[in-house]
Each structure stands twice: as structure tokens, then as C-alpha cells.
Regions:
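Residue-level detector of Asp-centered blade-edge/turn motifs that repeat once per structural unit
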Residues: 84-87, 156-158, 203-207, 260-263, ...
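Blade-loop segments of beta-propeller domains
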Residues: 78-79, 101-157
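Blade-level signature of beta-propeller repeat domains, shared across WD40, Kelch, NHL, RCC1
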Residues: 405-429
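Beta-propeller domain segments
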Residues: 4-63, 98-102, 106-116, 121-123, ...
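Asp-box/WD-like beta-propeller blade repeats and closely related beta-sheet repeat scaffolds
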Residues: 137-159, 165-205, 216-219
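Surface loop/turn motifs at the tips and blade-to-blade linkers of beta-strand repeat domains
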Residues: 70-75, 142-148, 188-193, 246-251, ...
């Protein structure tokens, strides 16, 4: 670590100690959260545990009535999961790539991210895992698709496999049960790469459209809104015509996407902006309206204006308030609908992988949670499913939750852990 990087980390650490004494004690979570007044940070808080990984015999802690085991291990930064119709499990292995720092704080952030194993050389592949004997542990692994550009979201429609690379959606010929993709891909839509680089995918119920989450380049449009065109949005791609459009906008970093079956509405989890305090604003879970605008970068949680940003009063007036707050800077990424009966003791609701904070005085996230639903809406407080990803002193991270899906048996969850390099399986005890 060079002197300037160390100096920046020391300053960031000092901000942690200074701000911890005035940090809110109550997390901004739920349908009606108590969001503290914004406190603009001249130097952003920088606090993140060093990546350690899991030692043999050590694993996350599970809620009462549940158990957890490693479905697959030895991966290279697993981020997203897709379960195929035959029970095979696809895992996107990708990582934020190192870039030249723009200023002193950026230099410190890059150093912190590398120490946390959140930045480096990306494997750029999709691997296939097969549990042939049904014991909850995969015995077979294949390189399903290689040579991609930070692959993330995946989907299969008929005889086509789709992957969301950071620079666009690519389609490949696919045969059910195949161990690997061998045909040439064709680009369907281009996205601006980098920044918030993940590109999640989900298919409509009728199989005619794909939706893609595309995050912003910057925190609050720092490099100008022209650079943000086509970003901070959810895109809709018509598979028959090839036409693509922005379905919803003003979503700073929409990652996980899921369908809620009662109303048929699309839901997403969104990572909100930095630099306004530990709980301000909270990340959130929300339904997504066609043509809806959700505030970024001008405002948050409805019409709460961010005065760091040149304003657009017409857009602020249109801003839709999210449905459910998930706490400040929890980095809620993974999302799947879990029907009642999947896990004992849990009803209908959304499961959310919280990757964990890096920019607040006290850590938040670093767990897998459940938000109960009734009549198509969140209906109560969140519950923890998995935790124990941090050392007791919070200096080390054993793992970090990311993508989550229903397991092939319909009675389990599979969750990607991109620090432990494991796919965890959660089932009834």
C-alpha cells in the first residue's frame, strides 16, 4: 500500500470514529421508516472488513428450524445464480475490475475494495454445477460459458441462453441439458459498461420480454447527467422485435429483480446514494411501475430533495416513494420470491441478500433476510435467515451474501457468497 492510499484510509477511518458517536441507533427499515435528516459528508466515511473467507468447519448461522451447507465451493467470486429446468445450477463468476483512481478518496476506496476482495481480476465466466444424487451438494462442475465481460444476470427462454454482461445482453444457442455453450453469441442490446456494473435479468411470465437492471455510473450524477443516459434504470427488451426501452428510471442501482405472483408486478432492490449519513437514505425494496420515476439523483424516498444535485422540480414532483426500506447502505443485491412451504416457519415473501456496507460508521447488512408479504405487499418486519458472515470484532468478513434463488428441489434456497467463494444451501433442519 503506497503512502497516499494509507493516508486516505487513515482519514476515512478517522471519519468513522468521529461519526460513530452521532450515528442513529435505529435502522431505517420497513414501510414507514424513520429516516434521519441528511448530514452532508465532506469526506465520506470508509469502513469495511478485510476479507478472510471460511475456515474448515465454519459456516453461517441459520434461523431456528433451518440448516445450511455448502452446495458448491472453490468458485471465483460467485455473484448470481440461475437454476435450469433440469436442476442444473448456473453461477456467474465476476468481479469489479480495478480502475485508475480519480482523486485521493477514490484511491482509498480502491485500496479498501481490494482488501475486501471486492475488486480485482474478474473470472468472466458462467459455471455449471450438478447435484446428481440429490444430496444437496454438487458433484459435477463445468465451464458453461467463458470469455464474457463481467457476466451477471442469466436466463433461458426456449432454445436460447441470455447473459447480462456489463456492456449488454448477449444471446447464445442453447440445448436443454447441455454442459456448455459452444455456439456464437449475438448482441441484442448495448449498455454503457462500468460504474455500477451488474446487469441482472428476469424473463416475463409469457416469455416474450426480458427486463434488465442497469445501475448508475456515479453516486449522484457526479460526472454530468449526459454520462448517466440509459443508466439508473430497468430496461425492457422485446425478444420478438428486438426493441428495447427504459421501463423505469431514477433507480440508482437496481440489482435483484423478482415477480410477485399475486399482482404479477415486478419488484427490485435498489442501492441508494452515499455521503448523507449512516441511515440516509435507506436502500429499498419496491414494486416497479411502467414509466415510473423513483427519484435519483434529485431526491430520495419520494420527494426528499438532495441539495447536492442541481434540481429538476418536474421530476421531483413525479418521484415515486418506494414500498419498503431495507436500512442504510446494506447493499441489498439478491432478490427472489419465496412461496410459503419452501422453508419451515416462513410464509410468502421476498428473500434478500444483503452484501453489506462499506461507507458508514457502523456496519450494516452482511446477512440474508426475509420480508413477509400479504396481498401483494410487504406485511411485517424483516426476519434474518442467515447471518454470521463477520468476525465478532467486525474486522474480518468470512463471506458476503449476493444472489439468491429457490433451489432445484423447491424446498431450499441457494445463495452466492462472493468472499467465501461458496454457494450456500439453506433448507429445513
Amino acid at each position: 500500500m503506497d503512502f497516499m492510499t494509507k493516508l486516505a484510509e487513515v482519514v476515512g477511518g478517522a471519519m468513522v470514529r468521529l461519526r460513530r458517536s452521532s450515528a442513529p441507533r435505529k435502522q431505517a427499515i420497513g414501510a414507514s421508516p424513520d429516516i434521519p435528516e441528511a448530514r452532508r459528508q465532506g469526506i465520506m466515511t470508509l469502513k469495511m472488513p478485510t476479507a478472510k473467507g471460511w475456515v474448515p468447519g465454519h459456516k453461517p448461522k441459520a434461523a431456528d428450524g433451518l440448516q445450511v451447507n455448502a452446495f458448491a465451493s472453490g468458485l471465483a467470486h460467485p455473484r448470481w445464480i440461475e437454476v435450469l429446468a433440469n436442476g442444473d445450477v448456473l453461477v456467474a463468476e465476476a468481479l469489479a475490475e480495478e480502475r485508475p483512481p480519480r482523486d485521493l478518496f477514490d484511491r482509498a476506496m480502491v485500496g479498501t475494495m481490494k482488501r475486501a476482495h471486492a475488486m480485482g481480476v474478474s473470472a468472466n465466466r458462467v459455471s455449471l454445477w450438478r447435484d446428481r444424487d440429490g444430496d444437496g451438494v454438487a458433484e459435477i462442475r463445468n465451464d458453461f460459458l467463458t470469455g464474457q465481460n463481467q457476466p451477471f444476470g442469466m436466463a433461458v427462454v426456449g432454445d436460447t441462453f441470455y447473459v447480462g454482461n456489463t456492456d449488454g445482453i448477449v444471446a447464445f444457442p442453447y440445448q436443454a441439458g447441455a454442459d456448455r455453450i459452444t455456439g456464437e453469441g449475438r448482441r441484442l442490446v448495448d449498455f454503457k459498461p462500468g460504474g455500477h456494473w451488474t446487469r441482472s435479468l428476469i424473463v416475463s411470465a409469457d416469455g416474450r420480454r426480458i427486463y434488465a437492471g442497469v445501475g448508475s455510473l456515479s453516486n449522484i450524477g457526479d460526472r454530468g447527467m449526459q454520462e448517466e443516459e440509459g443508466r439508473a434504470s430497468i430496461w425492457e427488451l422485446d425478444l420478438e422485435s428486438g426493441a428495447a426501452r427504459e421501463f423505469a428510471t431514477g433507480l440508482r442501482n437496481p440489482v435483484g429483480l423478482a415477480w410477485e405472483p399475486v399482482t404479477g408486478r415486478l419488484w427490485t432492490v435498489v442501492n441508494e446514494r452515499d455521503g448523507l449519513g449512516d441511515e440516509t437514505p435507506p436502500d429499498y425494496l419496491t414494486s416497479v411501475q411502467d414509466g415510473g420515476f423513483y427519484g435519483w439523483p434529485y431526491c430520495y424516498w419520494g420527494q426528499i430533495v438532495d441539495d447536492r444535485v442541481p434540481q429538476d422540480s418536474a421530476l421531483v414532483a413525479r418521484a415515486i416513494r418506494p414500498d419498503y426500506a431495507l436500512g442504510g447502505h446494506t447493499a441489498s443485491l439478491g432478490l427472489c420470491w419465496m412461496p410459503e412451504g419452501t422453508l419451515p416457519g416462513f410464509g410468502d415473501g421476498m428473500v434478500i441478500g444483503q452484501h453489506g456496507s462499506w461507507n458508514r460508521s457502523t456496519l450494516s447488512g452482511y446477512k440474508l433476510i426475509f420480508v413477509p408479504f400479504a396481498d401483494g405487499q410487504p406485511s411485517g418486519p424483516a426476519r434474518d435467515i442467515l447471518w454470521g458472515f463477520l468476525s465478532e470484532d467486525e474486522k474480518w468478513s468470512y463471506g458476503r451474501p449476493v444472489g439468491v434463488v429457490i433451489g432445484p428441489d423447491g424446498k431450499s434456497l441457494l445463495m452466492a457468497d462472493d468472499v467465501g467463494n461458496v454457494i450456500w444451501r439453506v433448507s429445513g433442519a
